[in-house]
């Protein structure tokens, strides 16, 4: 008779968000990455106003090639696996592009 023991490890996700800076000029390119660690590999999703914007396994990125004032706001990164769920937030601030021709 053969006895076997298996140990299954599970670790709830932990999130790390890379965003420098948090303020951007309208029209610039922006990329914000949310990375999560955990066992098993977590699913990562970005949300704004409860609408999913991006998803991936272990990482998900918010990418704006031409950020607009309407992109301004609070975004939520959520990571989950069988061991748990966690979330973190980032505030995206978009400033108007200064145009010298508008100055009188």
Which ranges hold each PLM region?
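Immunoglobulin-superfamily
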Residues: 1-104
């Amino acid at each position: 008779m053969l006895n076997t023991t298996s140990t299954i490890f599970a670790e709830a996700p932990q999130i790390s968000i890379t965003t420098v800076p948090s303020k951007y000029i309208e029209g610039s390119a922006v990329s914000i990455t949310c990375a999560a660690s955990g066992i098993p590999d977590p699913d990562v999703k970005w949300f704004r106003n409860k609408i999913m914007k991006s998803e991936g396994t272990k990482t998900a990125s918010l990418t704006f090639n031409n950020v607009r004032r309407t992109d301004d706001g609070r975004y939520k990164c959520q990571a989950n696996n069988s061991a748990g769920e966690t979330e973190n937030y980032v505030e995206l601030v978009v400033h108007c592009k200064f145009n010298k021709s508008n100055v009188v």
